[in-house]
Curated annotation (Swiss-Prot):
Name of the featured protein: 4-dimethylallyltryptophan N-methyltransferase easF
Broadest EC class assigned to this enzyme: transferase
SUBUNIT field: Homodimer.
Pfam hit, one: Methyltransf_33
Coiled-coil segments: none
MF (Gene Ontology): methyltransferase activity
Family: Belongs to the methyltransferase superfamily.
Lineage of producing organism: Eukaryota, Fungi, Dikarya, Ascomycota, Pezizomycotina
Pathway: Alkaloid biosynthesis; ergot alkaloid biosynthesis
Catalysed reaction, written as an equation: 4-(3-methylbut-2-enyl)-L-tryptophan + S-adenosyl-L-methionine = 4-(3-methylbut-2-enyl)-L-abrine + S-adenosyl-L-homocysteine + H(+)
Length: 355
């Protein structure tokens, strides 16, 4: 099989707006950093090391479900489907589903979407293409929004059956209101067209709200280097568009990893894990490159949240997004569940749990 092709579907270069995003986030309350800062190759290496640790239950549970239930999931995907993987950091999980599709002789095309071109290349190079005859592979370089526009507007794609993969607990990275909006947007753009009745979303959610289990997971080995690498990457990216003052000297930017702690906490009220960076010793003055913003000692710069969903919150999410559960796959003792979602019909039907 020939090498996997990659199509650049970006509507704009995301990095161009990064300086404004960083400054806006650092001026907000609470202070935040944009997710793009964590997409360096080094950062992703640290992340993959972190999520492979024994205490990081979300990944292990999701992989086990795909291993044990992949054949059932594959049967739910229509022949000739376009499978769009939103954020395909690596293939360790989804390869079990793809192998099940191959074993069933289903002709489908898997599109790996990633905002990072280098990471996308790594992902595609990991695919053992010689093992597949029925499953074809390609890459899409762009954002979530670019991917949804592509699947809904591309002439030879829009009327085929669609299966959108939203794994890795990605939906948990959004606030509950934003998650419903995003999921509804996926449904409105991907679950339409001539084959809409054969189209679906496969999405994972985590129901764990045990603080000790969550904090062990999100403080396991590798997470602190992952968080701190974002500061080094930020300086590299920021000094492109905002490099010099009138004297042609580089503008100062004080984002030294040694000056910061990684901070992990469970928010009982909002039902989410929160990840932040906090000054280690004293107030940190970020320099003129970042408009002389000061971060007070013990002040948090939040860079990530992971919302957990109990039954009521999950039901509300699906209701607000205009989708309904068709099937749910999990294993005994698991907090993670993978749901097959369809666009909501006028009459809501009951989901079937396969435990």
């Amino acid at each position: 099989m020939p090498a996997c092709s990659v199509t650049d579907i970006r509507s704009h270069v995301v990095e161009d707006s990064l300086p404004d995003q960083v400054i806006k986030g650092l001026k907000s309350s609470p202070k935040t950093l944009p997710a793009l800062l964590f997409y360096s190759n080094e950062g992703l290496d640290h992340w993959n090391h972190h999520v492979s640790q024994p205490d990081f239950y979300p990944r292990h549970q999701e992989v086990d479900i795909l291993k044990q239930r992949g054949d059932e999931m594959a049967r739910a995907i229509a022949p000739n489907s376009v499978i769009l993987d939103l954020g395909s950091a690596n293939l360790e999980k989804v390869v079990h589903l793809l192998k099940a599709l191959e074993a069933q002789g289903k002709d489908v095309t898997y599109f790996a979407l990633d905002i990072s071109a280098p990471q996308l290349e790594v992902t595609l190079n990991e695919i053992p293409t010689s093992e597949f005859r029925h499953v074809r592979f390609a890459g899409l370089h762009g954002t979530f929004e670019d991917g949804l526009r592509w699947i809904s507007e591309t002439p030879h794609i829009c009327d085929l059956p669609h299966c959108v993969l939203l794994l890795g607990l990605t939906i948990g990275n959004f606030s509950r209101a934003s998650a419903a909006t995003f999921l509804g947007n996926i449904a409105s753009q991907a679950l339409r067209g001539a084959s809409k009745d054969q189209s679906s979303i496969l999405m994972s959610l985590d129901s764990c709200k045990v603080p000790t289990q969550i904090l062990r997971a999100y403080t396991s080995n590798g997470v602190e280097p992952f968080a701190l690498q974002s500061l080094t990457f930020a300086k590299t990216l920021l000094r492109g568009p905002m490099l010099h003052n009138d004297s042609d000297e580089p503008l100062p930017c004080y984002l030294q990893p040694d000056d910061w702690y990684y901070h992990s906490e469970w928010n009982f009220v909002l039902g989410r894990h929160e990840a932040s960076l906090i000054p280690r010793y004293r107030d940190v003055h970020l320099g003129s490159l970042l408009q002389d913003i000061t971060v007070k000692k013990d002040e948090k710069i939040r860079f990530g949240c992971s919302y957990k969903y109990d039954d009521m919150e999950r039901h509300q999410l699906f209701l607000d997004a205009g989708v309904e559960q068709d099937v749910a796959w999990t294993n005994e003792g698991c907090d993670v569940v993978i749901y097959e979602l369809k666009k909501r019909s006028n009459t809501e039907k009951l989901g079937i749990d396969r435990n």
